[in-house]
Curated annotation (Swiss-Prot):
A lipid is attached at residues 2, 12, 95 (S-palmitoyl cysteine). CDD domains: RGS_RGS4 (cd08714). Palmitoylated on Cys-2 and/or Cys-12. It comes from the Eukaryota. This is Regulator of G-protein signaling 4. Gene3D superfamilies: 1.10.196.10, Regulator of G-protein Signalling 4, domain 2. It comes from Bos taurus (Bovine). One of its GO terms (biological process) is negative regulation of signal transduction. Residues 62-178 form the RGS domain. InterPro entries: RGS, RGS_RGS4, RGS_sf, RGS_subdom1/3, RGS_subdomain_2. Inhibits signal transduction by increasing the GTPase activity of G protein alpha subunits thereby driving them into their inactive GDP-bound form. Activity on G(z)-alpha is inhibited by phosphorylation of the G-protein. Activity on G(z)-alpha and G(i)-alpha-1 is inhibited by palmitoylation of the G-protein.
Length: 205
């Protein structure tokens, strides 16, 4: 396996350094790390310790593959942030967290928080929804349920899939990940190549 950047060929090292510069976001505290509530907030360690070339390539197969992977979600979120359009993925993440709520008493306050942040007229991070979906979601706020954001989340997912996801696949964020993850194969022929994310993302504290 590819252990860090030191063992890579010179050409790969240049690519790695360039990628490390472009993906400096991974060295900082990432909201996507906080998405996994099973880890202590005091000492969060990045889940994506290793990303194989095969996994990175799968991100190009579908948006679902991309955002269901910890590193993929982090890269996509950073790409959207660089375009000042991260509200869509933030809304999607909030909806995913909302659907995991077990206590009925916590649904209403969380639903209102999401609504005020992403959907209301005065939302600080308003997402682009059609009037019908926005009105439907507003009505759902009268008696919030676990599915009250499902339609809005589906619309935003489709929007990202048709727009920002396609741009992401052509961006340096993604292309650098593909190039670096393939470098391992130059050193070990026949072995499953992988990128050691720990060399780029030591921790998310």
């Amino acid at each position: 396996m590819c252990k860090g950047l030191a063992g890579l060929p010179a050409s790969c090292l240049r690519s790695a350094k360039d990628m490390k510069h472009r993906l400096g976001f991974l060295l900082q505290k990432s909201d996507s790390c906080e998405h996994n509530s099973s880890h202590s907030k005091k000492d969060k360690v990045v889940i994506c310790q290793r990303v194989s070339h095969e996994e990175v390539k799968k991100w190009a197969e579908s948006l679902e593959n991309l955002i269901s992977h910890e590193c993929g979600l982090a890269a996509f979120k950073a790409f959207l942030k660089s375009e000042y359009s991260e509200e869509n993925i933030d809304f999607w993440i909030s909806c995913e967290e909302y659907k995991k709520i077990k206590s009925p008493s916590k649904l209403s306050p969380k639903a209102k928080k999401i609504y005020n942040e992403f959907i209301s007229v005065q939302a600080t991070k308003e997402v682009n929804l059609d009037s019908c979906t926005r009105e439907e979601t507003s009505r759902n706020m009268l008696e919030p349920t676990i599915t009250c954001f499902d339609e809005a989340q589906r619309k935003i997912f489709n929007l990202m899939e048709k727009d920002s996801y396609r741009r992401f696949l052509k961006s340096r964020f993604y292309l650098d990940l593909v190039n670096l993850s393939s470098c391992g194969s130059e050193k070990q022929k026949g072995a499953k190549s992988s990128t050691d994310c720990a060399s780029l993302v030591p921790q998310c504290a």
